[in-house]
Amino acid sequence: MSMFCYQCQETAGCKGCTVKGVCGKDESVAKAQDLLIYVTKGLAVVSNEGMKVGVKDSKVNKYIVENLFTTITNANFDRDSILDRVRETLRIREDLKAKVVKAGGKVGEVKVSGGFFKKLFGIAKEEMVGPDAATWTADNVIEFDAKAEKVGVLSTENEDIRSLRELITYGLKGLSAYMKHAMNLKYDDETVHEFMAKALAATLDDSLSVDQLVALALEAGKFGVNGMALLDKANTETYGNPEITTVDIGVRKNPGILISGHDLRDLEMLLEQTEGTGVDVYTHGEMLAGQYYPKFKKYKNFAGNYGNAWWKQKEEFEKFNGPIVMTTNCIVIPKASYKNRLFTTGATGMPGCPHIEAKADGTKDFSEVIKMAKKCSAPTEIEKGQIVGGFAHNQVIALADKVVAAVKSGAIKRFFVMAGCDGRANSRNYYTEFAEKLPKDTVILTAGCAKYKYNKLNLGDIGGIPRVLDAGQCNDSYSLVVIALKLQEVFRLKSVNELPISYNIAWYEQKAVIVLLSLLHLGVKNIHLGPTLPAFLSPNVAKVLVDNFGIGGITNVEDDMKMFMQG
């Protein structure tokens, strides 16, 4: 069986990648990821059973989170490291299974079948109780490859069951990213891990109906909110509340290190280790949000933001001249001209690129990156100017009186939530045109790399309130929810859907999936997704979302604008 992957928006023909991923992963990597997800579900089954008999293990939680994160689009292209995780997952599963059985649990228990006389004459058959994912084991690549052929997405034959299982799995992948970042800052929530194990195990349960899986997907949204709230708490208590910040997009004269991705702990360690070295640190992509946190502003070598969204990195990384640190997705297969300057860490991986491992205490040594930077030229300037951001919930609520007054006076007629992701497709230019053509009495609320489609346009302000309010990274979509709920409270409305807010969201990968499920859990309706609806939504599952939540796609700027402005 050839590879099959349809987890991202750019999947081939909006149906599925079957020869090579549009992301760049080949068939061997795709199948290694399939196998890793399969054995992770098996580990979740054992973990779920363990909870029933009081057996819990934080190491298991951590590994489930990291495995899921590793398979997010554009995170890890290193087949060997993925298969190493498969081996370690099997080992951890068997260790946990022994503890569960000792405590009275049933999973993985050996049962002898065949009747009394077959047992007597030694010809009975031994069988393992539990899903195959919880009992299958192997120790070599040949067996891994053979198993991977059988456990991919298409191994679930029923289209609707498959769709819902993948919707849940992709939501959990997104949630895993947020949990991992929070855990890196020593914040955690056991209830989220318990749900993740339960939900992963449920995707192996053939007895569950479509209705039960729909309910589970919405429950994933509940824990998505909890996960984003936890990460918001971790980030703000560690680094302070984001504040209105003007960020340079030009360059300085010193050599630099470019840090991309989402992990603020990695950013902190890099700033600590580069201080006083003569090496500047620039943010890239969604790491732009690091510029908004007060704690990072004390570092004099913390320069501005270099470049744009992830998909432009081949051109921009080449011109940066110095080393690049990828803390999370999104990585694009690098050009030879800068591949030796690309470092991965955390869940990321790229064959031929050095990987920086965390020590037992979670710290990382960036000395090799700094050493390389000192030998490199300063970044080539690709643009000049400044952008403004830092409008997370605490900052916007501090401006609440001003915002409310603008709404009451009619100066602000409508808010547009245009959070989400950017991508390669030309069809995404829709979002630039949409932002440009919005009436001057509207305000864009954004988070994630979707902002790069319009955050450098001169869209002006309304009474001193910028018309683009950037809350930060994709996880900071939580801030947009908090802002909406606060406005609902201020205006004394029964539902958040009564607010003059429209949702025109660009999605790309699995973190956007958990954001969507979180919004649905909160009761937000009439969300429009683009540039295409997810390929993993079967017609019947899509109909459920349309009928119950008003989910829709996009068409063209003119028609969509009229539809949104009508409320």
Swiss-Prot record:
Its main location: cytoplasm. It is found in: Cytoplasm. It catalyses: A + NH4(+) + H2O = hydroxylamine + AH2 + H(+). Hybrid [4Fe-2O-2S] cluster binds at residues 262, 286, 330, 421, 449, 474, 509, 511. This is Hydroxylamine reductase 2. It is an enzyme of class 1 (oxidoreductase). Binds 1 [4Fe-4S] cluster. GO terms for biological process: response to hydrogen peroxide. The modification Cysteine persulfide is found at residue 421. The gene is hcp2. Its EC number is 1.7.99.1. Belongs to the HCP family.
